[in-house]
Amino acid sequence: MHQKARRNKMEKRSNRNQKGPILQVARESIHFFKNYRQWSNKTFIVVLLIVVAISMALTLLAQGIKGIPLTSSSTTVVSQTADSKEKTTATEQETSARIMANGDLLYHIPIYRTALKEDGTYDFHENFEYVKPWLKQADLVIGDFEGTVNKDHYLGGYPLFNAPGEVMDAIKDAGYQVLDLAHNHILDSQIEGVFSTADAIEKAGMTPIGVYTHEPRDKAPIVIKEVKGIKVALLAYSYGFNGIEEYISKEDYDNHLSDLNEEKMKAEIERAEKEADITVVMPQMGIEYQLEPTEEQKQLYHKMIDWGADIIFGGHPHVVEPAETVEKDGDKKLIIYSMGNFLSNQRIETMQDEENAKWTERGVLMDVTIKKKAGKTTIETAKAHPSWVNRTPKGTYSPEGYPLYLYQTYILDDFIEGGKYRSQLDEATKERVDTAYTEMNEHVGLKW
């Protein structure tokens, strides 16, 4: 008790001693202010600053002696700022992007004829009049350009596709950023056509995938598009090249083409999975005009998911095949086995011998929203918008005497009952549109 009383007494004396200098400075300051008129303005300011500085120093010294941390206030500010930065960073990491993709852009000769102008050039913009507003809503748009562009080769449709260079202007203007060239028609204008087609795409301001024209396949980087802070890897593969690969060297085949070699695909998809936030694969395989995928398709596409693919946009059959969701590690992945045709001259009127002829004029516009949160990217929503190619007689003829048609792709949401363009359709077209819309939704069966 005596020791505690003695300690309290010493602390009080210490506190009195600490207050003494402060009170003394205060008294002197009062005395100064009473007599400040005796000083010049300059001298007054200098002395005032000295007095304030001494007062602040003594106050801080007194607080330090009493055990009050001199930096407590600034530490709190730093801590709050750090917390704010963490919250801001977390918020910045929560981002979403919308990806759209469609199937074959298949330019048959009748489409060229209609696009030909009097001056000998071509204009394909009207093909995408009703598609463009949809594509412009997306952050990344991917199409499958099934053919080549080679000005040193004759124009052609089936079986050797080679389109005028102007197609790329229209495709770019519609909103596409990436075009898949891994398909069975990429050699239709020889190995030179691989390079000229990729070059035409790049000159139009887009990116080709599925061919390698700058570096050999085994040395080329994975194509990754950063969209709103999300890195999207893009890979594409083809089952074959219509036998034309037999007429090119093994070196050209290995260096420039992207086939379904499982060892190579596995390595590339695994690499993409490490380098990007989400991986999109566009394989071309299956049986033409068949509405269901083969067992080979199912097995391989599921392997791709196992290797690291998140989204698989399939193609080749020229008709739409169903979609499927696959759960992996608690997250849903997306497969659509075939997106069908998005623009072509294949239809009921031209494919009368084909059992599924009506399906060749139909396709889907895949509409997928991906979300990145806290470093993890997942598929948030996925939709398959039915599409249909309308072919309307223009009432005019080509110089060779062929009838000309207006080819336009419709996103059927806009043309069914209640759609903004419904009133433009005649009764026969309304029935065709409504049937296509209903059958397509049932067939694709995508419920996310």
Residue positions per predicted region:
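Acidic, metal/ion-coordinating pockets
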Residues: 2, 11-15, 20-36, 41-448
